[in-house]
């Protein structure tokens, strides 16, 4: 008992924080409320809460009286929806950094968009994609897995406004019937968040440059 206490006191806590550059993927407070226009000329207003952070712990166990290091990992999250409640988006970036070696500085991004869950290792998959540039996207209600491509675009123009630093995700393998309003293509900009999306592979919404006053 005493030995376990002594060994536990030797456990070291290492703190992992989300990389500074990745904090820019969340919408600034002035960009949380906005409007989007779809192909049918229907305008929808969106509201997002300011980004918030929390921490979780990993490790800290004692195996065969040998203490393991404890990790404290930062997570930053931001959520919002349109006024109709038909589009819900939540973005979380986590400082896991558990794999070591060449993966030791990678933050994980999880983009929840209605029933879709896109998972991405930002530093690796977005800037140094695999040779086939194919990653897994999940449908949360069915757990069906599909493939999507990811790319980083230096700049992209939507509704005559230019955005710098844009993440482009596109579904490339639809093997199952999709749930309604499933996002098949997403453009996500630094400091702004969602700027364009295509639902059900047929209806596209584009962000308007003016900020909603609602």
Name the predicted role of every residue range.
Residues 11-214:
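Conserved functional acidic sites
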Residues 6-9:
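C-terminal motif of bacterial Sec signal peptides marking the signal peptidase cleavage site
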């Amino acid at each position: 008992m005493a030995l376990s206490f002594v060994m536990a006191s030797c456990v070291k806590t290492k703190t992992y924080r989300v990389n500074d550059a990745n904090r820019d993927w969340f919408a600034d407070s002035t960009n949380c409320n906005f409007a989007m226009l779809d192909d049918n000329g229907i305008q929808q207003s969106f509201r997002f809460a300011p980004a918030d952070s929390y921490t979780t712990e990993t490790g800290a166990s004692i195996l065969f009286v040998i203490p393991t290091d404890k990790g404290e990992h930062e997570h930053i999250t931001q959520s919002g929806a349109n006024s109709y409640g038909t589009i819900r988006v939540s973005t979380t970036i986590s400082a896991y950094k558990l794999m070591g070696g060449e993966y030791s500085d990678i933050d994980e991004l999880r983009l929840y968009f209605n029933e879709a869950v896109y998972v991405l290792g930002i530093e690796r998959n977005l800037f140094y994609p695999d040779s086939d540039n194919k990653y897994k996207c999940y449908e949360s209600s069915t757990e069906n897995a599909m493939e999507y491509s990811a790319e980083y675009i230096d700049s992209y123009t939507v509704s005559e406004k230019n955005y710098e630093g844009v993440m482009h995700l596109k579904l490339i393998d639809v093997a199952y019937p999709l749930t309604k309003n499933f996002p098949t293509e997403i453009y996500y900009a630094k400091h702004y968040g969602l700027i364009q999306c295509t639902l059900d592979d047929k209806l596209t919404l584009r962000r308007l440059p003016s900020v909603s006053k609602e």
